[in-house]
Amino acid sequence: MANRGPSYGLSREVQQKIEKQYDPDLEQILIQWITTQCRKGVSQPQPGRENFQNWLKDGTVLCELINSLYPEGQAPVKKIQASTMAFKQMEQISQFLQAAERYGINTTDIFQTVDLWEGKNMACVQRTLMNLGGLAVARDDGLFSGDPNWFPKKSKENPRNFSDNQLQEGKNVIGLQMGTNRGASQAGMTGYGMPRQIL
């Protein structure tokens, strides 16, 4: 949290809840994938949330990652340079986010720049990178490097084609939502509180 003081009360509870969502095992998987995918001497950080954040904070690793998912000459981020200036780092992070959105990640799955730069929500950063990896595996264009089992499998379209005869038969079936004339019924039941009549 670079520019913010400590949070108190409800803000502190919310921040602690967000920090509990961070997964150290997932961090190791993501580091392994990023270093495998980038190949260009990307160093591996020490384990830990802060080290992971500092590794990604300047945006160069993220830009190298998104560029490695595109064919040669079609890289979305043209200029990648390490910088110590805050606005340059944030600009590179936002370039990665724009390129990730063009790659196919939903806007709802993308973290905000401050989530990474200030370390406010590193779990959201992990989710974005997981979605990016899963999408790269699903594309199956030969540009993904690493183990496809690191990421959840994306579902693929599976259309069903029914003949006119099958569609017509489906109209004749009475759905269970309409009710059924079999099974238990209320025949012989008495109202609540009435005594049993034994004859």
UniProtKB/Swiss-Prot annotation:
Recorded superkingdom: Eukaryota
| Pfam families for this protein | Calponin, CH
Which residues get modified to Omega-N-methylarginine?
Answer: R182, R196
Tell me which residues bear Phosphoserine: S11, S163
SMART domains in UniProt: CH (SM00033)
Q: For the cross-link Glycyl lysine isopeptide (Lys-Gly) (interchain with G-Cter in SUMO2), list the residue numbers.
A: K171
What PROSITE patterns does the annotation carry? CALPONIN_1 (PS01052), CALPONIN_2 (PS51122), CH (PS50021)
Q: Does the keyword Phosphoprotein belong to this entry?
A: yes
Q: Does the keyword Phosphoprotein apply?
A: yes
Which InterPro entries has this protein been placed in?
A: Calponin-like, Calponin_repeat, CH_dom, CH_dom_sf, SM22_calponin
N-acetylalanine modification, residue list = A2
Q: Which UniProt keywords apply?
A: Acetylation, Isopeptide bond, Methylation, Phosphoprotein, Ubl conjugation
One GO BP: epithelial cell differentiation
Sites where Phosphothreonine occurs are at T180
Q: Which family does it belong to?
A: Belongs to the calponin family.
Protein name per UniProt: Transgelin-2
Source organism: Rattus norvegicus (Rat)
